[in-house]
């Protein structure tokens, strides 16, 4: 009886040890599995473009490790605390934060060209399907500019020009140009792209890249793209902004320097036509090769935008004129800059200087005679009677000689018959051909043909004759008396 009890105890002890050995071997086999059994590979994509009509593309093959992981988990008994911690750490390491890495944050595209954006998608979904149904949204936010040169200049100095949210650029309504969805089965879907073939969105499933092409870029395509990766609950996981800067070099640069009179200040305007964006042009001035600085109280600049042509800038400057020196060479230097691109151009003009003529008007022998000194060639005379232009009044204008004080200037004389209308008439001699106001150089006088004016000279003459006769008569009488009286005595 006692021996039987001892045998039972030995068997029981051996049985528990066997069970313990079996469990230990099973635990050891589970712990010896590789750590990557429960880890999905990075999404394997086949290179095919996303269609714009919403048709699903080729599916992503399911990872074969999923089935293996499920089988192992089924065969595994209740894990120990150590194995649970190891599995949890492994699962946490699989939760890599997704990211979008683009080749550039700013893309400069010239007008009518194609703009391209290329980004890498770093997406490594864990075994649970938290990110297995992700979404990729591409939104375009256009940027327009205020047509206010003061704002543009202040923003350019502050470095804020073109920054969304600033006072110098304001976005129009955002436009969702593509929304790409991945369902749990691995199929990709995309929403139709707006504006026809304007945008082309693609995903390379092998290289894990996505791209956006903007074809035939115009001014409305200036703005920034938002590329947002969302989870299955539509929560944003990562967001990137890529700016598309539409560029256009100035089409032409011209300097206009209007003619001036001697002693008056020179004025010049620099016109920079058809560039983009506003604020990308810098203007500087030169006078005979030396730097000239515009004055804020009388000089400035302004710009406007022409649809389909771009911006045009006009900058003005005022320069002193002593009247003793030759007209200066006024130059405008223009630098257009966008990113690392720089384009320069310049234009030069020399203003023409005119000198004040001397005009005198007199009446003689039934004519109004105008005498002009020191005028350039091409200047003629127009007569006005009571401020009414008279026809055919330039034929009787002749050159009387050369100006003695100004080279290549000459003297003129012109006349017109006075009207015998027994009235007081205004005659005006006006110089035509100067690039100034038409009444800038003229002289006016009145000719009095009234009866009182005509009779006055005759009365004066008769009075003078009678006075002279009376004076002579009195003289003769006095002389006669002088001779007569002494003889009588």
Curated annotation (Swiss-Prot):
Domain of life: Viruses
Keyword Membrane among UniProt keywords: yes
Transmembrane residue ranges: 456-486
Disulphide connectivity of cysteines: none
Record's compositionally biased regions (Polar residues): 60-69
Limits of the Ig-like domain: 250-348
Glycosylation sites noted in the Swiss-Prot or TrEMBL record: 92, 112, 204, 346, 392
Signal peptide: 1-32
Pfam family, one: Marek_A
SUPFAM superfamilies noted in UniProt: Immunoglobulin (SSF48726)
Subcellular location: Virion membrane
Keywords of this entry: Glycoprotein, Host-virus interaction, Immunoglobulin domain, Membrane, Signal, Transmembrane, Transmembrane helix, Virion
Biased composition range(s): Low complexity: 70-81
GO cellular component, one term: virion membrane
Topological domain ranges for the Cytoplasmic compartment: 487-489
Family assignment from sequence similarity: Belongs to the herpesviridae glycoprotein C family.
Annotated protein name in UniProt: Envelope glycoprotein C homolog
Organism for this UniProt entry: Meleagrid herpesvirus 1 (strain H2)
Gene: gC
């Amino acid at each position: 009886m006692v021996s039987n009890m001892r045998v039972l105890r030995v068997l029981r002890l051996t049985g528990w040890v066997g069970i313990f050995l079996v469990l230990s071997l099973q635990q050891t086999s589970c712990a010896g599995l590789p750590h990557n059994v429960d880890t999905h590979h990075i999404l394997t994509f086949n290179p095919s473009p996303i269609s714009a009509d919403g048709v699903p593309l080729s599916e992503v093959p399911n990872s074969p490790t999923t089935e293996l992981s499920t089988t192992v988990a089924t065969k595994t008994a209740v894990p120990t605390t150590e194995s649970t911690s190891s599995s949890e750490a492994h699962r946490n390491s699989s939760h890599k934060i997704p990211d979008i890495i683009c080749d550039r944050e700013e893309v400069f595209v010239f007008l009518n060209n194609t703009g391209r954006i290329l980004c890498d998608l770093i997406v490594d979904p864990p075994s649970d399907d938290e990110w297995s149904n992700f979404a990729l949204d591409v939104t375009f936010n256009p940027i327009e500019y205020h047509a206010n040169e003061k704002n543009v200049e202040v923003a350019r100095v502050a470095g804020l020009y073109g920054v969304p949210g600033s006072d110098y650029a304001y976005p129009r309504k955002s436009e969702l140009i593509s929304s790409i969805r991945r369902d749990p089965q691995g199929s990709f879907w995309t929403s139709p792209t707006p504006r026809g073939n304007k945008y082309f969105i693609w995903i390379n499933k092998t290289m894990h890249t996505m791209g956006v092409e903007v074809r035939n870029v115009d001014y409305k395509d200036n703005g920034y793209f938002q590329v947002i990766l969302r989870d299955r609950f539509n929560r944003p996981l990562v967001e990137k902004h890529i700016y598309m800067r539409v560029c256009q070099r100035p089409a032409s640069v011209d300097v206009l320097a209007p003619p001036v009179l001697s002693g008056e200040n020179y004025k010049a305007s620099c016109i920079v036509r058809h560039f983009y964006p506003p604020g990308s042009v810098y203007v500087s001035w030169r006078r005979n090769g030396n730097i000239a600085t515009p004055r804020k109280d009388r000089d400035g600049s302004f710009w406007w935008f022409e649809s389909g042509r771009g911006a045009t800038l006009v900058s003005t400057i005022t320069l002193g004129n002593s009247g003793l020196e030759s007209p200066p060479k006024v130059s405008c230097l223009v630098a257009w800059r966008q990113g690392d691109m720089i384009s320069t151009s310049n234009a030069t003009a020399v203003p023409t200087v005119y000198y004040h003529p001397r005009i005198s008007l007199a009446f003689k022998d039934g004519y109004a005679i105008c005498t002009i000194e020191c005028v350039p060639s091409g200047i003629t005379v127009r007569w006005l009677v009571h401020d009414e232009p008279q026809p055919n009044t330039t034929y009787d204008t002749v050159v009387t000689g050369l100006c003695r004080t100004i080279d290549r200037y000459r003297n003129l004389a012109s006349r017109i018959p006075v009207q015998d209308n027994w009235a007081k008439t205004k005659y005006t001699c006006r110089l035509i051909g100067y690039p100034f106001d038409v009444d800038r150089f003229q002289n006016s006088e009145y000719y009095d043909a009234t009866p009182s004016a005509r009779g006055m000279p005759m009365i004066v003459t008769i009075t003078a004759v009678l006075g002279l006769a009376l004076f002579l008569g009195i003289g003769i009488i006095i002389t006669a008396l002088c001779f007569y009286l002494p003889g009588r005595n």
